[in-house]
Amino acid sequence: MIPICPVVSFTYVPSRLGEEAKMATGNYFGFTHGAAAQYSQQPASGVAYSHPTTVASYTVHQAPVAPHTVTAAYAPAVATVAVARPAPVAMAATAAAYGGYPAAHTATDYGYTQRQQEAPPPPPPVTTQNYQDSYSYVRSTAPAVAYDSKQYYQQPTATAAAVAAQPQPSIAETYYQTVAPKAGYSQGAAQYTQAQQTRQVTAIKPANPSPASTTFSIYPVSSSVQPVAAAASVVPSYTQSATYSNTAVTYSGAAYSGYEAAVYSAASSYYQQQQQQQQKQAAAAAAAAATAAWTGTNFTKKAPFQNKQLKPKQPPKPPQIHYCDVCKISCAGPQTYKEHLEGQKHKKKEAALKASQNTTSSSTAVRGTQNQLRCELCDVSCTGADAYAAHIRGAKHQKVVKLHTKLGKPIPSTEPNVVSQSVTSAVSKASATSSSTSSANGSSSVASPAVKLLTSSSSMSTSNSSKVSSISSTSIVKKVTTPKITFIGGNKLQSTGNKVDDSKMSDISKATPSSAAQTQEVKIDPMSEAAQTLAALQSDVQPVGHDYVEEVRNDEGKVIRFHCKLCECSFNDPNAKEMHLKGRRHRLQYKKKVNPDLQVEVKPSIRARKIQEEKMRKQMQKEEYWRRREEEDQWRMEMRRYEEDMYWRRMEEEQHHWDDRRRVPEGGYPHGPPGPPGLLGVRPGMPPQPQGPAPLRRPDSSDDRYVMTKHAAIYPTEDELQAVQKIVSLTERALKLVSDSMTDQDKTKTKESDEKKEPTKERALKGVLRVGVLAKGLLLRGDRNVNLVLLCSEKPTRALLSCISESLPTQLAVICPEKFEVTSSIPEAAIILNSCVEPKMQVTITLTSPVIREETPRDGDVTPGMVKDPPDVLDRQKCLDALASLRHAKWFQARANGLQSCVIVIRILRDLCQRVPTWSDFPNWALELLVEKAISSSSGPQSPGDALRRVFECISSGIILKGGPGLLDPCEKDPYDTLATMNDQQREDITSSAQFALRLLAFRQIYKVLGMDPLSQTNQRFNVHSNRKRRRDSDSVDSFEAEGKKDKKDYENF
């Protein structure tokens, strides 16, 4: 093909006036726009062509090669065009390829093929003849043709054919955005902007008026273009340069007839409904701009113009289909679609979809264990094979299949697929991600969901399949190969091809791994288990009760419905009859009314499950409450003990201090009065006082002085304490030597008798411990007996007892030269050690072993434990009593030793039990428990007198009587009353004696209870013996003796 090369020369005449000059002021040419160089007011490099600000006229001299006036369309050239600026190029060959320049053109003659990455899209040719009312074009018969520079702006209310005749808005729209509203695609004459490609524009630089004439040639080049339309799958990207170097491009691809026309028809209809207000404003602005352009006052005020090309009316547009992805339905029109979006059904499904996305792990764990059969097309799940088959045959599924067939969407296979609840959640999350991605890419000003306008000719199969594949078992993401037109309620048309936005690709890449990961989690189970589950779901349950379902016919004998007598229900679907007979409800009624032996799976109701969960939750809360309460009680008890210890420590220090102050010698201080406080607040010669303000202390009462005086009288002397300490320490050391000797003998015998290596046996004697009053510190003056417990590794026997009793004197002789008498008592299971030096002391060593208490005889059989025992084992009860004394000593050291006045009061009462026969039957261990409970239960620390009074009050209240609460032993596993050894008479006698002692305390006669003489009064006013009045001989003797006799009688009764 030979290219037509017209030579066009432009002559610049700066002084021309008249109508043509005014028209030229607008700088309007018959050039169409779409992919041409852009005009602006900033000069670009290599631009020699400039426009003045004065009135100018342009004449075009056409070479005789072209038969008519040139109104060049922008077309790319193969070779570099040596021009001063990027100018429009006439391409005759291209015009020939598109059907030449005749006026009659149809929209179907234009096909859009796939563009390569570097080639700008070629627009349709522009005709210069037969212009309609939109243009005022003047042709000149002279060789120099003058162009009318005025372009009349037409409002964007054109018909669909006029809109469809515009050059390639589907491709160029994404890259060339206009200032005026979008419906008519009207643009400013000298300003172009791009939405997605940033390009530098060539500016128009003002130049001085000059009569010089600039001539340049335009060489159009031919480009072979296939007349068959093809879908544009590649959006070209442009690189701005001073000159355009484009090569000839051959376009090829699949043909999509009517694709562009349908798109622009949809765009026209949509924007006519949404942007009528903006069109009116744009029309007013265009009129004002046109008026300013005719005045020629300013070069920059140029009225926007639209393309000066017309095409014949297009064929009727195909019907629009508004499809809702959430509800899987289509709407007839935008109004119906809008009403659907505002309806309750759509809102409920959308809320259900959001709820499924926000499903917690607990709900998933409850409902996720049930396998279901899912229909990918309708996005519904069925609990069994029968339900799935009924759904496939149902009208809803068939309707969706028909709609997808009409839209050209792929229809998934109807084979049932086993899915779980986690798969459904993954699908919902994936769909939510894709919808959020599409809404984020479009600048939407409407809050409604995206409206998808689909035509029957547009193929959406690939994008649909990609969405389906993202939720299927495989995580393969298919590449989008066809454009997806989505109108989102805004003012911007999005048309995308293979070049997907980076943000969308990033969102897709982020969404895909998550869905793939969820799918992989679902497919952890092997295929065999999935097959078994599918077989279990598809396993047919035998229908029962055919005879109880009767057919209801009309007058003509036609079956209109079915009625089940068992369930009292009716249904008109023949398919539902079989399902009802297999259903759980019908089977339960059949089992209840007909055959009780029918096996029906037990499926707990949601209400029962919720009740069970509520019970478990309350139980856990109750356990947590009690656990916390126990911890708090334990913490309070520990804090109370700590505070009491600290308080009593300060009290003792203060008591020592005041005792030292009261013990000042009669002659005064030996070294003079105490001096001033030292550097650390301590007076010389005085014990250090506690820091801080001294707590207020109640002065000693009369009862306290009596109790302390009595305690000092019954406390052991220093000689007795040293004697006890000496004999106990010697006994402990001797028993240690006996244990060592017995261990050495066992080793020697083992080596001689057997050469085999055996595990080393434990020592026969594990240790010796102090028990009784010796361990508790309750010794009284005159006590000569102390107790020790010797722990053995095995059950003690008579042979062991005799062996120890024989070895003990030898070891004692090694340690101490003094003589001791050692005797063994088999009935008492003990060894008795007596000293021969005054004060004579006696130590009772009881043998026991922890193995005895660990034995628990079986129910109904008392002898198994005794069968294994050696024949000469010692008395079991004596050994158990020794173990109990160990526990008692440990408890006393932990609980009673820390209480103030507790040990003092126990010593006083032990002395009372020894002096008064009534109290001799009171057990020592029960007495210790009673005193500890009485003192520890008080609100604060008790002085010795108050503590003794409180103990008598407790006994007087009847705590030890037969019907009383008693005293449980805290050292025993099973409940055991420590007062069990006392009879009723002994309990009543002790209670009565305590009440009498309490009366004596109330009348200041505590000395009678303690069995001591009254103390002398330190104050002379209360001293009876200092009475100066002379006593009558007769009265004094009778009254004193009588009073003394009465006191003596009361004391003896106590």
From Swiss-Prot:
Compartments (UniProt record): Nucleus; Cytoplasm
Pfam families reported for this sequence: DZF_C, DZF_N, zf-met
The DZF domain, residue ranges: 683-1053
Record keywords, A-Z: Cytoplasm, Developmental protein, DNA-binding, Nucleus, Repeat, RNA-binding
SUPFAM superfamilies: beta-beta-alpha zinc fingers
Record-linked InterPro entries: DZF_dom (IPR006561), DZF_dom_C (IPR049402), DZF_dom_N (IPR049401), Matrin/U1-like-C_Znf_C2H2 (IPR003604), NT_sf (IPR043519), Znf_C2H2_sf (IPR036236), Znf_C2H2_type (IPR013087)
Comp. bias (Basic and acidic residues): 744-761, 1042-1054
Organism: Xenopus laevis
GO CC, alphabetical: cytoplasm; precatalytic spliceosome
Primary location recorded for the protein, binned into one broad class: nucleus
PANTHER family (alphabetical): ZINC FINGER RNA-BINDING PROTEIN
Role played: Involved in postimplantation and gastrulation stages of development. Binds to DNA and RNA.
UniProt entry tagged with the keyword DNA-binding: yes
Highest taxon, organism lineage: Eukaryota
Protein name, UniProt field: Zinc finger RNA-binding protein
